[in-house]
């Protein structure tokens, strides 16, 4: 995972399996988490921890154990790479389980601060739609995080980096993923005290198990949200270009609605198959939200926004409703955006309405003439 200030221009991305965005001007003050900040997080979130009787405390691993698990970080075990370092698939003999092991680059984008925040957050928080942190390693200058292994990779892999021969996501699976990701965000916003602002929601941070069940990952940028009569927390602007809420990019004032905006961008990606920022497109279509806003105003154009990879196999009413949710989430004014709980309600309903492509006609004509409808995902 990599970050750049949200207000900056998108830089060229390295072609890796994970985002290769660039983080700029990381200050030395970011390389540690203050004792008061850690204490506040621990005490404030302790109630959430105590409510989860099935919570598993993160284990500590030696570097030697993780080297053995990945066969000395062999290239064949590499499953992801980005500005933070590399992710390997490994087998933990001590727990008899397969795991994803993230080895942070000493000179990479994720410093000690982000490492500590992620260990702290994922040790205290537990929800089916959050990735499970198995443990970590802090031997000498080595920093590694050990997660449950998610065999289908990230949502980004299935929307934008589809390998040859891989079937695109069908409509039902897309709505299932959208609803699950929203539930993970709802847990952070509404089920913890104080709330947690994720701050880095994007397709590459939504991981999928072998049944396309989504889990949010990478909590290095997460912040404790406002409490009492405070409406926001002020922080240096960090995130990924294309996903940041405009008011956060301009002022550094972070709210729960900042996450809702980011979710709206992700939902648009799920529906349209387009990237949040795509420099390969014409000028007016490079920014997904800017491209979508004029189309939101004319329902007759909604079918133009459906991912061509769906080949017209989607429910028109479901498409309109999903786009309506996305449009509300990416409103420029944060007070006009819905609460994430309302988003969960809407998307859970859409996910429950199973679409049968064999029982309904193909919509539109955006796919190539003569292209046969795809078979249903098994």
Curated annotation (Swiss-Prot):
The modification Phosphoserine is found at residues 204, 234. The modification Phosphotyrosine is found at residues 147, 248. Phosphorylated at Ser-43, Ser-46 and Ser-234. Residues 32-47 have a biased composition (Low complexity). Gene3D superfamilies: Phosphorylase Kinase, domain 1 (3.30.200.20), Transferase(Phosphotransferase) domain 1 (1.10.510.10). ATP binds at residues 79-87, 102. Residues 18-29 have a biased composition (Basic and acidic residues). Interacts with BSU1 and BSL1. This is Probable serine/threonine-protein kinase PBL7. It comes from Arabidopsis thaliana (Mouse-ear cress). The gene is PBL7.
């Amino acid at each position: 995972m990599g970050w750049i200030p949200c207000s900056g221009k998108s830089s060229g991305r390295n072609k890796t399996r994970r985002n290769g965005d660039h983080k700029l001007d990381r200050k030395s003050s970011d390389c540690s988490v203050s004792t008061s900040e850690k204490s506040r997080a621990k005490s404030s979130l302790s109630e959430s921890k105590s409510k989860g009787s099935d919570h598993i405390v993160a284990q500590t691993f030696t570097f030697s154990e993780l080297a053995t698990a990945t066969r000395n970080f062999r290239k064949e075990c590499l499953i992801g790479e980005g500005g933070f370092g590399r992710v390997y698939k490994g087998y933990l003999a001590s727990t008899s389980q397969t795991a994803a092991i993230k080895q942070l680059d000493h000179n990479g984008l994720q410093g000690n601060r982000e490492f500590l925040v992620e260990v702290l957050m994922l040790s205290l928080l537990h929800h089916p739609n959050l990735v499970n942190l198995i443990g970590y390693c802090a031997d000498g200058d080595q920093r590694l995080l050990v997660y449950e292994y998610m065999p289908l990779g990230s949502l980004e892999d299935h929307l934008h980096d589809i390998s040859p021969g891989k079937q695109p996501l069908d409509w039902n699976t897309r709505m299932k993923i959208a609803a699950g990701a929203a539930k993970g965000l709802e847990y952070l916003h509404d089920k913890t005290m104080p709330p947690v602002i994720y701050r880095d929601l994007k397709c590459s941070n939504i991981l999928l198990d072998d049944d396309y069940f989504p889990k949010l990952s990478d909590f290095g940028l997460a912040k404790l949200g406002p409490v009492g009569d405070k409406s926001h927390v002020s922080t240096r602007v960090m995130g990924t270009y294309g996903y940041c809420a405009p008011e956060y990019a301009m002022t550094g004032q972070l709210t729960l609605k900042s996450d809702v905006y980011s979710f709206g961008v992700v939902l648009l990606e799920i529906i349209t198959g387009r990237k949040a920022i795509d420099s390969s497109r014409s000028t007016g279509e490079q920014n997904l939200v800017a491209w979508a806003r004029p189309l939101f105003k004319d329902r007759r154009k909604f079918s133009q926004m459906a991912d061509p990879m769906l080949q017209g196999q989607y429910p028109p009413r479901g498409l309109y409703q999903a786009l309506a949710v996305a449009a509300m989430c990416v409103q420029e004014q944060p007070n006009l955006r819905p609460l994430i709980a309302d988003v969960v309600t809407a998307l859970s309903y859409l996910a429950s309405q199973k679409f049968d492509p064999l029982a309904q006609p193909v919509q539109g004509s955006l796919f190539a003439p003569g292209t046969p409808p795809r078979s249903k995902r098994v």
